[in-house]
Amino acid sequence: YNRELISRHVSGRLKVAPEHTCSRVLDIMRKPPFSLFHEFKKIFDSVNRTEGLNQQLIPYFISSHPGCHEEDMAQLAVETKNLNFHLEQVQDFTPTPMTVATEIYYSGYHPYTGEKIFTAVRPEEKLAQRKYFFWYDRNYRDDILRSLNRINRRDLAASLFPAYRQSAGTRHPSVASQKAKTGRNKKR
C-alpha cells in the first residue's frame, strides 16, 4: 500500500500529521507513537530512491497542546532537525468543541483519569513553545539558547546549533563574534 501510494498517488509533496514527538502528548491526542512516523519516513525515502522520485514529505506539528511543556518542544526541534526538516506546517493548539484536549485546556484535568495536566494558555507560554519550530531561523537562535538555559536543557543547544560550545562561560558564536567586532569583550 505505501509503495503504491508514494510512487503513484503523490504529486510531489505528501503532507502527514504526526503532530508531536513526545509520547505523553501523543497519548493525550490519542495518536500513535512518533516511531511510526520514523518508519514511514524510511519507507517514503526508500521508495523515492528506488523509483527515482524527488518528492517531499511535509509533516504537520502542533505546539501548546495540553500536556506539552517547553522542554517537549525543545526535544521536538532536535528530533525534526535530525530528520532534516525545516518545519513549515505548524500551528498553535486551538480548542475545538467536544474533544478531550479542549476539556483539559479549560479544566486543567484529564476527564478520564482526573490527572492534573499542564497546558500553556498565556501568550508568553505559547510563544515560548512555538519558537522551537523555527530553530533554523537566526532570528530565534538567541532566544532559544536563553530558553534552553532557563529550562536547564543546555545539552540540546549543541544538537540544534552545532557551532555552539557548551563549556562553562563560553557564549555561542554569534554573541562572541559580535563582541569581538565591537570590542565590548576587552577588559578596561
What do these predicted regions represent?
Residues 98-188:
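Radical SAM enzyme core and accessory elements
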